[in-house]
Structure formats: structure tokens, C-alpha cells
């Protein structure tokens, strides 16, 4: 009985650990000037190595920022811009299971495709106020 309890406890610990680790989908690799993220109605200042999460709204002030996602997608956000990560799923073993949807709400963003686009370019969608770009 004790062994069963130990096994269940260990399984629950591993499950919750994976959930916590999966929140970060990328990191700030370059930061110059003011940049912040709106996350769950909180505004946080971004610095180099800050984590980026699903549904984040990344905003730049007078500076710019570079983000590298876990699939090796790189995004450079210019000053006075806003980028929302609407959807991000990365499964390196599935062409149809991965997806990246970004909304460039304001300003200029430079995108360099990573593994999601290499697996299936149709799974990348970049939206702007006036257009929609498929990779």
C-alpha cells in the first residue's frame, strides 16, 4: 500500500512539474530601452532572459527587444510596438500538432522562422491590423 501511495505521489509531482515548466515558451535574448509584458492583467518589466508565456502582450517603449521561442523562432520587436502571442504549441514530433499565431497589434516586428514553420509552414499565422501573413 505504501508503495502504491509513493508511486501516485511521484506521478502527481511529475505531472505538476511539467505543467509549471511548460508555461515559458520563449525568452528575451536582446533588450534595449523600455519593454514590458502584460500577463494576466499584470504589467511586468522585461529584461534579458525574462520568460515569455502563452497569451503575453509584449510592448516596447523607446527600445527594442528580441525573443527566441523554444522552437528556435526568433522575433525582433521594434520601438513603440505591441505583439500578442495568441497561440503557441510546439511538438517536434508532429507536423500538425505545432502552431504559432502572433498578432502584431502596433508597430514593426521582424520574424525568422523556427521549427514550427519547418515542420509545416501553414501552422504559422502572423496577423496585423490590416493584413494576415501565412508563412
Language-model-detected regions and their locations in the chain:
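Flexible, surface-exposed loop/linker segments and immediately adjacent secondary-structure boundaries
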Residues: 20-64, 69-134
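Bacterial N-terminal signal peptides that target proteins for export
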Residues: 1-8
Amino acid at each position: 500500500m505504501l508503495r502504491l501511495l509513493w508511486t501516485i505521489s511521484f506521478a502527481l509531482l511529475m505531472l505538476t512539474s511539467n505543467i509549471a515548466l511548460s508555461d515559458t515558451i520563449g525568452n528575451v535574448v536582446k533588450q534595449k530601452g523600455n519593454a514590458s509584458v502584460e500577463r494576466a492583467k499584470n504589467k511586468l518589466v522585461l529584461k534579458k532572459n525574462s520568460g515569455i508565456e502563452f497569451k503575453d502582450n509584449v510592448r516596447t517603449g523607446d527600445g527594442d527587444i528580441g525573443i527566441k521561442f523554444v522552437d528556435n523562432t526568433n522575433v525582433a520587436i521594434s520601438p513603440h510596438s505591441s505583439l500578442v502571442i495568441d497561440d503557441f504549441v510546439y511538438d517536434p514530433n508532429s507536423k500538425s500538432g505545432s502552431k504559432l499565431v502572433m498578432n502584431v497589434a502596433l508597430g514593426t516586428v521582424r520574424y525568422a522562422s523556427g521549427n514550427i514553420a519547418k515542420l509545416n509552414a501553414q501552422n504559422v499565422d502572423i496577423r496585423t491590423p490590416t493584413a494576415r501573413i501565412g508563412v
